[in-house]
Amino acid sequence: PYKTFCARFEKPIVQEDDKDALRRLNQLTGPFILRRMKSEVLKELPPKTENLHRIELDEQQRKLYLAAVVDAREKLRAAKPEDKMAVFAVLMRLREICCDPRLVADNWDGGSAKLEACMELVTAAVEGGHRILLFSQFTSMLELLAKRLDEAGVSHFTLQGSTPKPVRAELVRRFNSGEADVFLISLRAGGTGLNLTAADIVIHYDPWWNVAAQ
């Protein structure tokens, strides 16, 4: 059952980066998976180019982050050694602040250096005729990105884990046919065999530390 799978594999791999659980899952699924390399299928595709963009937090954002670090240290000191979820929650909050402080503070009236940098990348790419897949782990971040794309007049679709399968298929078809320039996708929803051949740029807004999940 799914609960057993979550306990044995999904939670240890996704939340705890358990290499042993990942190895066991690979052993179980290996005989049923045929992996084809890009070079074996489409030889005319250019090689993948990866660019890492490091963004400095603005002053307000940095102050909020440092305050969260102080709070995190206090919580971790009080946590029990076996309480892995406490560590995970602390790291997650720091990641959210880096993405956009509004993910943790509803009354935030400052900006987000990362969001601004992402929008610069997206608008420049769209103006250059590119199509983009934009991934985030946080659905609330996708909502903020969608709002900014609307303000910038950039056409886009959004796919989340709650999106029904028939709707997913229709969104994929419409994106591949050129009806939108950007496809916003939650990281977990993206791992469902989507065939998005129209995009030539992929942006991971908040890269996940577990490469297998990403």
Stretches with model-predicted labels:
Residues 1-40:
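Conserved P-loop NTPase motor "coupling/switch" region that bridges the ATPase
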Residues 8-11, 71, 151:
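A short linear boundary/processing microfeature
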Residues 12-19, 73-81, 105:
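Short, polar/flexible loop-turn hinges at active-site or ligand-entry regions and domain interfaces
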Residues 25, 32, 36, 68, ...:
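AAA+ P-loop ATPase catalytic core
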Residues 43-67, 79-194, 198:
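Conserved Helicase C-terminal RecA-like lobe
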Residues 202:
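Short conserved active-site loop signatures built around small residues
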Residues 211-214:
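Conserved SF2 helicase motif VI
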